[in-house]
Amino acid sequence: MRSQSGSGVSDRGAAARAPVERARAEAFRAVGELEAAIGLALAALPDESRFRPWLTRIRADLVDLGSDLALPFEGERRPPLRIEARQVQWLEATCEQARREVVPLRAFMLPGWSEAAACLRAAHGVCRRAERRVAGLARLEPAGSHRAAYLRRLGDLLFVFARAVDADTGARPRLRRPSAATLARAAERIAPEPAPPRQAPA
C-alpha cells in the first residue's frame, strides 16, 4: 500500500529500511567520534612529531569513510567517496613499520602514559566501537569489503602508535600482571580431571 505523502515509498518499505538507517546513523556517528578523538591526539602531539603526517592522513581517510557510510551502495554513475583497498594497504604497511620501532610484546602492555599516547589509546577504543557499528551495518545491507577492514587495521595501528609515542617521550611501559585470583581460575581450567576410582574385580 502506498503512503499518502506522495513520496512513492510504501509504508512497509519505509519500515523495512528503518533498522538499516538506524545502523547507518550509529556507524556514521561512531566514525565522527573517532575522527574527533584522533584530532585530540594531534593536538597533544608536539609540532615536530613524526606521527603528525600519518594521523593527518588518517583523518582525511575518515572523511572518505564517512561519505562511504552516508550513502548506500547503489548503481550510481558517479559514486561518492569510498574506502579503497589502497587505503587499507597503507595502514598495514605503516603498522608494520611502526611495530619494528617498538619493543616486541611479551606480555599484555598498557600504553598511554604520556598525554598524546593516552589520547591515542582512547582513540583505539573508539575505533574498535566504530568497527563493531560498521560490522552491524554490513549485516543488514550489502557493503564494500573495505570499510570494516580499514577500521580493523586502524585499531591495530593506533595501539602501536600509542606504544611508540610513549617510547618517544621516555614513558616507561606498564605490564598488566594478572591477579592471584585470575591465575587460580586459569589453573583450575587447565588442571586435569581426577581419574575415576578403579572398581575391585568381582
Where are these regions (language model features)?
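Phosphate/pyrophosphate-binding loop motifs in nucleotide- or prenyl diphosphate-using proteins
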Residues: 1-202
